Regions:
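Catalytic core of pol beta-like nucleotidyltransferases
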Residues: 1-29, 38-43, 54-112
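Short beta-strand->loop micro-motif that forms the acidic, two-metal-ion catalytic signature
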Residues: 48-52
Length: 112
């Protein structure tokens, strides 16, 4: 995460900690992808984060709103100068579809 502004790094770290508190060991991996991972971000870029878990689909649906609320709280703390854009997926399905879905391939390729 070099060359990323300090406030963005701190927000990503805070978000990751809050996700760990919420989901515990169910979190298998947190991936930063997109423009911040590639280093070609600008002032309008959002912060793309994928959360891979071992949760079932119905559990993911339950937690999706809570995760969005966590992201919103951090965005609010930063006066919306940054925008976290979290996505939560089941790790087994991610790995299964990794070589078939371009979105997953990009996350894997760019992700840090």
């Amino acid at each position: 995460m070099k060359n990323i502004p300090q406030n963005v790094k701190e927000s990503i770290q805070k978000f990751t900690i809050e996700i760990q508190k919420l989901l515990g060991e169910r979190v298998k991996k947190v991936i930063l992808y997109g423009s911040y991972a590639r280093g070609d971000y600008n002032s309008d870029s959002d912060i793309d984060i994928m959360i891979l878990t071992d949760l079932a689909d119905n559990e993911i649906d339950y937690y999706r709103r809570k995760i969005s609320e966590l992201a919103y709280d951090i965005d609010f703390e930063n006066n919306f100068d940054i925008m976290l854009s979290p996505v939560i997926k089941n790790i087994e399905k991610f790995n299964y579809w990794l070589n078939a879905l371009p979105f997953y391939m990009n996350v894997q390729k760019e992700g840090v």
